[in-house]
Amino acid sequence: MRNAIFIAGTDTDVGKTVASKAILQALATHNIATIGYKPVAAGSDKTEFGYRNSDALHLMKAATVDMPYEDVNPYALVLPTSPHIAAKHENVTIDYALLSNKLSKHKQNAELVVVEGAGGWRVPTSDSDCLSTWVKQERLPVILVVGIKLGCLSHAILTAEAIRADGLELVGWIANRINPGTEHYAEIIEHLEGRLGTPKLGEIPYMPKAKRQELGKFIQLDHLLEPDTVA
Protein backbone atom coordinates (compact mmCIF):
# COMPACT_ATOMS: atom_id res chain seq x y z
CA MET A 1 0.00 0.00 0.00
CA ARG A 2 1.21 3.50 -0.79
CA ASN A 3 2.24 5.53 2.24
CA ALA A 4 1.19 8.91 0.82
CA ILE A 5 -1.07 10.19 -1.95
CA PHE A 6 -1.52 13.68 -3.35
CA ILE A 7 -5.01 15.02 -4.01
CA ALA A 8 -5.00 17.36 -7.00
CA GLY A 9 -7.90 19.31 -8.46
CA THR A 10 -8.84 20.50 -11.90
CA ASP A 11 -9.28 23.98 -10.41
CA THR A 12 -9.96 25.72 -7.14
CA ASP A 13 -13.31 24.98 -5.44
CA VAL A 14 -13.81 21.64 -7.19
CA GLY A 15 -13.91 19.57 -4.01
CA LYS A 16 -10.37 18.59 -3.07
CA THR A 17 -11.20 18.82 0.63
CA VAL A 18 -14.47 16.94 0.17
CA ALA A 19 -12.65 14.16 -1.68
CA SER A 20 -9.75 14.12 0.78
CA LYS A 21 -12.16 13.83 3.69
CA ALA A 22 -14.07 11.07 1.89
CA ILE A 23 -10.85 9.10 1.40
CA LEU A 24 -9.84 9.58 5.04
CA GLN A 25 -13.27 8.47 6.25
CA ALA A 26 -13.21 5.41 4.00
CA LEU A 27 -9.74 4.44 5.22
CA ALA A 28 -10.89 4.80 8.83
CA THR A 29 -13.48 2.06 8.28
CA HIS A 30 -10.57 -0.25 7.44
CA ASN A 31 -8.73 0.70 10.65
CA ILE A 32 -5.90 2.30 8.67
CA ALA A 33 -3.91 4.95 10.54
CA THR A 34 -4.18 8.17 8.56
CA ILE A 35 -3.06 11.78 8.64
CA GLY A 36 -4.48 14.57 6.48
CA TYR A 37 -1.81 17.03 5.34
CA LYS A 38 -2.49 20.46 3.82
CA PRO A 39 1.00 21.84 3.11
CA VAL A 40 -0.17 25.21 1.80
CA ALA A 41 -3.53 26.89 2.39
CA ALA A 42 -4.58 30.38 1.34
CA GLY A 43 -7.52 31.80 3.24
CA SER A 44 -7.26 31.46 7.01
CA ASP A 45 -9.19 32.87 9.95
CA LYS A 46 -7.72 34.35 13.11
CA THR A 47 -8.44 32.30 16.23
CA GLU A 48 -7.19 32.32 19.80
CA PHE A 49 -4.66 29.69 18.72
CA GLY A 50 -3.42 31.59 15.66
CA TYR A 51 -4.52 31.53 12.04
CA ARG A 52 -6.43 28.42 11.01
CA ASN A 53 -7.63 27.22 7.60
CA SER A 54 -11.02 25.51 7.59
CA ASP A 55 -10.01 22.88 5.03
CA ALA A 56 -7.04 21.83 7.15
CA LEU A 57 -9.32 21.56 10.18
CA HIS A 58 -11.66 19.27 8.23
CA LEU A 59 -8.71 17.02 7.38
CA MET A 60 -7.66 16.89 11.02
CA LYS A 61 -11.16 15.86 12.06
CA ALA A 62 -11.34 13.06 9.49
CA ALA A 63 -7.87 11.63 10.16
CA THR A 64 -7.31 8.89 12.73
CA VAL A 65 -3.94 10.14 14.01
CA ASP A 66 -3.82 13.40 15.97
CA MET A 67 -1.11 15.85 14.96
CA PRO A 68 -0.47 19.49 15.91
CA TYR A 69 -2.07 22.01 13.58
CA GLU A 70 1.31 23.42 12.60
CA ASP A 71 2.32 19.99 11.28
CA VAL A 72 -0.93 19.50 9.37
CA ASN A 73 -0.85 22.96 7.76
CA PRO A 74 2.63 24.54 7.85
CA TYR A 75 1.59 27.50 5.71
CA ALA A 76 -1.77 28.93 6.78
CA LEU A 77 -1.72 32.04 4.60
CA VAL A 78 -4.33 34.65 5.43
CA LEU A 79 -5.48 36.04 2.09
CA PRO A 80 -7.90 33.87 0.06
CA THR A 81 -5.97 34.17 -3.19
CA SER A 82 -3.20 32.38 -5.07
CA PRO A 83 -0.59 31.15 -2.57
CA HIS A 84 2.24 33.09 -4.21
CA ILE A 85 0.29 36.35 -3.91
CA ALA A 86 -0.74 35.67 -0.31
CA ALA A 87 2.82 34.69 0.59
CA LYS A 88 4.21 37.85 -0.98
CA HIS A 89 1.78 40.06 0.95
CA GLU A 90 2.74 38.29 4.19
CA ASN A 91 6.50 38.29 3.50
CA VAL A 92 6.52 34.49 3.56
CA THR A 93 8.68 32.18 1.48
CA ILE A 94 7.20 28.73 0.95
CA ASP A 95 10.06 26.36 1.75
CA TYR A 96 9.82 22.95 0.10
CA ALA A 97 12.34 21.50 2.55
CA LEU A 98 9.93 22.31 5.40
CA LEU A 99 7.06 20.68 3.51
CA SER A 100 9.19 17.56 3.00
CA ASN A 101 10.23 17.43 6.65
CA LYS A 102 6.59 17.56 7.75
CA LEU A 103 5.66 14.85 5.25
CA SER A 104 8.45 12.60 6.51
CA LYS A 105 7.19 13.09 10.07
CA HIS A 106 3.67 12.17 9.01
CA LYS A 107 4.85 9.02 7.24
CA GLN A 108 6.46 7.89 10.48
CA ASN A 109 3.19 8.30 12.36
CA ALA A 110 0.62 6.96 9.89
CA GLU A 111 0.12 4.16 7.42
CA LEU A 112 -1.19 6.54 4.78
CA VAL A 113 -0.88 10.32 4.48
CA VAL A 114 -3.50 12.10 2.39
CA VAL A 115 -1.86 15.26 1.05
CA GLU A 116 -4.30 17.87 -0.22
CA GLY A 117 -3.06 20.38 -2.78
CA ALA A 118 -4.11 23.98 -3.31
CA GLY A 119 -5.88 25.28 -6.39
CA GLY A 120 -5.06 23.47 -9.62
CA TRP A 121 -2.02 21.45 -10.65
CA ARG A 122 0.13 24.45 -11.61
CA VAL A 123 -0.83 26.67 -8.68
CA PRO A 124 2.10 29.07 -8.11
CA THR A 125 3.97 29.12 -4.80
CA SER A 126 6.28 31.93 -5.93
CA ASP A 127 6.83 34.08 -9.00
CA SER A 128 8.88 31.28 -10.56
CA ASP A 129 7.64 27.98 -9.15
CA CYS A 130 4.55 25.82 -8.60
CA LEU A 131 3.47 23.38 -5.91
CA SER A 132 3.68 20.60 -8.51
CA THR A 133 7.48 20.94 -8.35
CA TRP A 134 7.39 19.74 -4.75
CA VAL A 135 4.99 16.91 -5.61
CA LYS A 136 7.42 15.79 -8.34
CA GLN A 137 10.30 16.02 -5.88
CA GLU A 138 8.46 13.72 -3.47
CA ARG A 139 7.33 11.37 -6.26
CA LEU A 140 3.82 11.30 -4.85
CA PRO A 141 1.13 9.29 -6.65
CA VAL A 142 -1.80 11.52 -7.56
CA ILE A 143 -5.58 11.30 -7.36
CA LEU A 144 -7.39 13.86 -9.51
CA VAL A 145 -10.62 15.45 -8.28
CA VAL A 146 -12.88 16.62 -11.08
CA GLY A 147 -15.58 19.12 -10.19
CA ILE A 148 -18.35 18.16 -12.60
CA LYS A 149 -19.46 21.31 -14.38
CA LEU A 150 -19.46 22.83 -17.84
CA GLY A 151 -15.83 22.97 -19.00
CA CYS A 152 -14.55 20.23 -16.72
CA LEU A 153 -13.72 17.84 -19.56
CA SER A 154 -10.93 20.02 -20.95
CA HIS A 155 -9.68 20.88 -17.46
CA ALA A 156 -9.57 17.22 -16.45
CA ILE A 157 -7.87 15.97 -19.62
CA LEU A 158 -5.26 18.76 -19.55
CA THR A 159 -4.54 18.20 -15.86
CA ALA A 160 -4.14 14.45 -16.34
CA GLU A 161 -1.74 15.12 -19.22
CA ALA A 162 0.30 17.52 -17.07
CA ILE A 163 0.52 15.08 -14.16
CA ARG A 164 1.78 12.32 -16.45
CA ALA A 165 4.14 14.70 -18.26
CA ASP A 166 5.69 15.38 -14.84
CA GLY A 167 6.44 11.66 -14.59
CA LEU A 168 3.95 10.96 -11.82
CA GLU A 169 1.46 8.13 -11.45
CA LEU A 170 -2.20 9.11 -11.77
CA VAL A 171 -3.67 6.36 -9.60
CA GLY A 172 -7.30 7.36 -9.98
CA TRP A 173 -9.87 10.12 -10.18
CA ILE A 174 -12.94 11.16 -8.24
CA ALA A 175 -16.02 12.88 -9.64
CA ASN A 176 -17.50 15.54 -7.37
CA ARG A 177 -20.87 16.92 -8.41
CA ILE A 178 -20.60 20.58 -7.45
CA ASN A 179 -23.64 21.79 -9.39
CA PRO A 180 -26.89 19.80 -9.17
CA GLY A 181 -28.13 21.51 -12.31
CA THR A 182 -25.28 20.41 -14.57
CA GLU A 183 -26.82 18.96 -17.71
CA HIS A 184 -25.65 15.70 -19.34
CA TYR A 185 -23.98 14.55 -16.12
CA ALA A 186 -23.95 10.86 -17.08
CA GLU A 187 -22.42 11.63 -20.47
CA ILE A 188 -19.69 13.73 -18.85
CA ILE A 189 -18.83 10.88 -16.47
CA GLU A 190 -18.80 8.38 -19.33
CA HIS A 191 -16.42 10.54 -21.35
CA LEU A 192 -14.04 10.99 -18.41
CA GLU A 193 -14.06 7.24 -17.76
CA GLY A 194 -12.96 6.70 -21.34
CA ARG A 195 -10.40 9.50 -21.55
CA LEU A 196 -8.54 9.67 -18.24
CA GLY A 197 -7.10 6.17 -18.46
CA THR A 198 -7.16 5.53 -14.74
CA PRO A 199 -9.77 4.04 -12.38
CA LYS A 200 -12.67 6.11 -11.10
CA LEU A 201 -12.43 5.82 -7.32
CA GLY A 202 -15.83 7.29 -6.61
CA GLU A 203 -18.62 9.73 -7.40
CA ILE A 204 -19.60 12.18 -4.69
CA PRO A 205 -23.13 13.48 -5.25
CA TYR A 206 -24.12 17.09 -4.76
CA MET A 207 -25.11 17.81 -1.18
CA PRO A 208 -25.32 20.99 0.88
CA LYS A 209 -22.44 21.49 3.32
CA ALA A 210 -20.68 18.42 1.92
CA LYS A 211 -17.60 18.91 4.11
CA ARG A 212 -19.75 18.21 7.17
CA GLN A 213 -21.15 14.94 5.81
CA GLU A 214 -20.13 11.29 6.08
CA LEU A 215 -18.52 10.75 2.69
CA GLY A 216 -16.50 7.55 2.96
CA LYS A 217 -19.28 5.43 1.47
CA PHE A 218 -18.77 7.10 -1.90
CA ILE A 219 -15.15 5.93 -2.27
CA GLN A 220 -13.95 2.57 -3.59
CA LEU A 221 -10.66 1.73 -1.91
CA ASP A 222 -9.63 -1.50 -3.65
CA HIS A 223 -7.31 0.11 -6.19
CA LEU A 224 -5.94 2.57 -3.66
CA LEU A 225 -4.97 -0.19 -1.25
CA GLU A 226 -3.11 -2.25 -3.83
CA PRO A 227 0.65 -2.71 -3.24
CA ASP A 228 2.71 0.19 -4.55
CA THR A 229 4.59 -1.10 -7.57
CA VAL A 230 5.97 2.24 -8.70
CA ALA A 231 9.59 2.90 -7.76
Swiss-Prot record:
Protein name from the UniProt record: ATP-dependent dethiobiotin synthetase BioD
Record the organism.
Answer: Vibrio cholerae serotype O1 (strain ATCC 39315 / El Tor Inaba N16961)
Q: State the EC number(s).
A: 6.3.3.3
Q: Which residues form the active site?
A: 38
On assembly, the entry states:
Homodimer.
Coiled coil regions, renumbered to chain = none
Tell me, in a sentence or two, what this protein's role is: Catalyzes a mechanistically unusual reaction, the ATP-dependent insertion of CO2 between the N7 and N8 nitrogen atoms of 7,8-diaminopelargonic acid (DAPA, also called 7,8-diammoniononanoate) to form a ureido ring.
Query: Which UniProt key words apply to this protein?
Result: ATP-binding, Biotin biosynthesis, Cytoplasm, Ligase, Magnesium, Metal-binding, Nucleotide-binding
Q: In which pathway does it act?
A: Cofactor biosynthesis; biotin biosynthesis; biotin from 7,8-diaminononanoate: step 1/2
- Family listed: Belongs to the dethiobiotin synthetase family.
Gene Ontology terms: cellular component: cytosol
HAMAP family, per this entry?
BioD
Determine if Oxidoreductase is one of this entry's keywords: no
InterPro entries from the entry?
A: DTB_synth_BioD (IPR004472), P-loop_NTPase (IPR027417)
Record's catalysed reaction(s): (7R,8S)-7,8-diammoniononanoate + CO2 + ATP = (4R,5S)-dethiobiotin + ADP + phosphate + 3 H(+)
Q: Which residues bind Mg(2+)?
A: 17, 55, 116
